[in-house]
Amino acid sequence: MDSASRSTSSLASSSSSRSGSVADIKMDDNASVDSGFASASSSTSSLPLVSFTHAHLKHLNSQLETMQPMDILRFCKVLFPNLYQTTAFGLTGLVTVDMLSKLQAQTPGMQPTELIFLDTLYHFQETHDLVERVKARYNVPVHIFKPAEVNTTAEFEAMYGEKLYELSSELYDWIAKVEPQQRAYSELNVAAVLTGRRRSQGGQRGDIPVIEIDEERGIVKINPLVNWSFREVKAYVDEHKVPYNALLDQGYKSVGDWHSTVPVGEGEDERAGRWKGQNKTECGIHNKKSRYAEFLQRQEAQKVSA
């Protein structure tokens, strides 16, 4: 059996016991979720913790657009319950961690914003080293979520085969990133998340607002540094001596999995080193959930017909 067949077989055979199984995914895809928007006919018993009308969200974004990131964070800390930061410990996320630490120092009674880190099992060792340095520096809880039922790269490859990221990048993204993220949101009861996305990163991020609603997942996403350039982010890191990934001193600018990240050349975009030569700009966690539900429904059909 080749690696691609083995990975599909493993997914099907473990679906009955795994959190976020194929059957669960199908049910989740068909179930209704709170979008974060409220209408005049909404029942108060069914409203999510945070709800907006479209007009209210538009107004908030118009006001936040001109605010500094620290002020956006201060505002969001007050407005959103169950607020977390999801991060791969890139520069923008690290700036956010540092700013939140400063806000915490100003208001000691304020609940700290805890971090969510998706350990794909294919991160660089330098990234794992950075996680430990951030935990030591900022004394902030880091919730680490790995692919279901595996703890090491060897276990992952025994279940799904070697180089799944090459054989089926969509399946890899689901198993290593999207499902663990979904599990994190559910287990931690996340209502809103801070992200490290910025418009200057280009691609699908070129026109994102400060606050957006992920209607499929039923959460609010906040992009506090949306207006900053890479130069501004790096200047903050240098000025405030924020710990950063050692790979940035070796020509990297955006760091993901080791199998899909390379240094960038002079004048290349910040994220040019991610998925080099592929028609891809996002790892999956910011793509629509339905994109993966459709894929997994095909896997379920294959399992039934087998």
Locations of regions flagged by a protein language model:
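Nucleotide-activated chemistry modules centered on ATP-dependent adenylation/adenylyltransferase
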Residues: 2-306
